[in-house]
Every structure is written in structure tokens, then in C-alpha cells.
């Protein structure tokens, strides 16, 4: 099943191991361009999971310039919980250095937005820190730094970007560019309008919208104690009543409680 997280294009027979709940569902309105979401750390901050979101491109020399949103194509990065923000972190990782990480370990799990970097830019390598822009006051950055969602849906718009001279905007051999790190105690989802210059040509301005979210997983058995009527995939969490004592005459191997 091509929609499974562990889809194997070389497989000829379904062995029943398809997994639908360990990865994110992603969509894009442009073929060859999209987003990836990966788990970067679990419990780096107790009770939180750190995710990294990447733009994926069609070519290694594609240049990712900006992530934006406005009323016609909102930019949203949302959680059902809160985003962790380190006390010395920023909206971008421009303050992250080895020295500071040694003094403040939780800075490694700070939530931030970026283009291609997970620490302070190295100008000697042609790197540039991402800049942010907002069309309204207060800026979206204020709420985000307080642990809230990113939502940019006004008429003027906003987002983050790098100049064409920044080496960190180039996709490279893995054909992807880091767009953000988000540490949350909830479910992560979002939608981004991503600007790309195909093959590094700024005269070819491509803007695509990509979305991501966790699959709807839960107990799909209506006869279980904890059915989830909204779940699309069963994640093995169903609970069944019965005797759980293996020494008893009426032991039920399928019982949980």
C-alpha cells in the first residue's frame, strides 16, 4: 500500500505489516516539491517530541528562498499542546552555538524557523541567518516565542526568508532544506507556502503549498472498551475486559483490563 509509512515499492505480496501511524501525512499542490517531517528527539524535554520540517525539491541545485503566508494561502504551524521555547532561544537558530549548548542543554530542543540551518550562520561558508517579516502588529513571532501556534493569514502576509546569496538555501544532494524545528507536547500539523528558484534561477519563481499532519490513529474496534470513532487506522491501542491472571481458570489472553 503506497499510503503506508513502510511502503516497499519492490514488494510483490502484502505481508500484513503495513504501518500507517508512525509517519506524517503530507500533501503538495506541485509535483516534485513537498515537505518531510521527521522526529528529531523524544523526551529531550520531558514529555515533548522534537520534530524537524523540511522542504523537498525536484533538483539538487534548487534554491529554497522563503516560507510565507497571507489570507489567500495561510501559513500555519499548529499543535494541540504547546511549543517548547528555551529561555535563551530565538525565533531562528541564530543564537545556537556549541558554547551556549554546553551551558544550556535545552537550547538543542528550542522551537524555531529557518532556511537550511540549525545553528548560527557561518559567513565564511556563505551562510546567512533567516530573517522574519510580519505585516501586522504584534508580529507572529511574539506568539510563537510564547509557545503558541504560528498563524499568518492577514492581507499583507509574512513569514521568513534568506537572500539569494545564502548557500544554506541550496537543496543539495538530499534535495531538501530544513524549514523549522518544533518541540511540542501535542500533535503537530501545518501548511506552508514555499518559494523556490528551480535550478537556482531567480527568474523562475515557483511557489507551492504543502501541508502536513499526523494520521488519524486509534482503536477502530467498536466492541473494545476505548473505540475512537474518528480514527482511520488502528494503532493497536484497543482495550478488552477479561481475566488477565494467567494462573486463573478463566484466563483470557486477549484481555487488557
Go through the PLM ranges and name each one:
Residues 1-257:
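Primarily marks secretory-pathway-exposed extracellular/lumenal segments that are disulfide-
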